């Protein structure tokens, strides 16, 4: 029985999908069609009768449901988004994440803008 539970979709993932369907007023059949999966497949996931789909399908579900950021759905699925893997492997990142937990929303927005400016400057430097 334990192995069955291990392969079920996590509750947070299911909740995000169901909430997204409610907000977008989209049926299971419509979501399945737009995400490129069968309604039966999606129903089994949402009813905890099947494990998670591929990362590509998870991202597609998030896009169809306008879940922002779409990476949130991957995280709720227990997966690390590919774009985050390289960043998280840098030794400075854990210290940065710990420090940001204490910032106000305003300071967090300033930090994001600074990081984006640094990234843009770095990208331009590599383009030369």
Model-derived segments and spans:
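Interfacial/linker helices and their anchor residues that mediate assembly or domain coupling
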Residues: 78-128
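A short, Lys/Arg-rich alpha-helix, primarily the initiator
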Residues: 1-26, 110
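Recognition helix of helix-turn-helix/homeodomain-like DNA-binding domains
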Residues: 36-53, 60, 75-79
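Conserved hydrophobic/aromatic packing and binding residues within compact polymer-binding modules
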Residues: 17, 31-32, 42-45, 72-73
């Amino acid at each position: 029985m334990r192995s069955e539970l291990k392969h079920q979709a996590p509750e947070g993932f299911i909740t995000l999908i169901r909430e997204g369907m409610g907000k977008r007023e989209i049926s299971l059949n419509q979501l399945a069609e737009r995400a490129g999966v069968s309604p039966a497949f999606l129903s089994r996931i949402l009813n905890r009768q099947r494990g998670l789909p591929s990362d590509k399908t998870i991202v597609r579900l998030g896009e169809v449901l306008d879940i922002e950021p779409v990476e949130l759905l991957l995280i709720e699925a227990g997966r690390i988004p590919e774009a985050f893997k390289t960043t998280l492997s840098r030794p400075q990142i854990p210290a940065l994440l710990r420090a940001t937990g204490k910032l106000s929303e305003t300071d967090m927005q300033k930090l994001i803008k600074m990081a984006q400016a640094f990234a843009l400057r770095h990208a331009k430097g590599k383009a030369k």
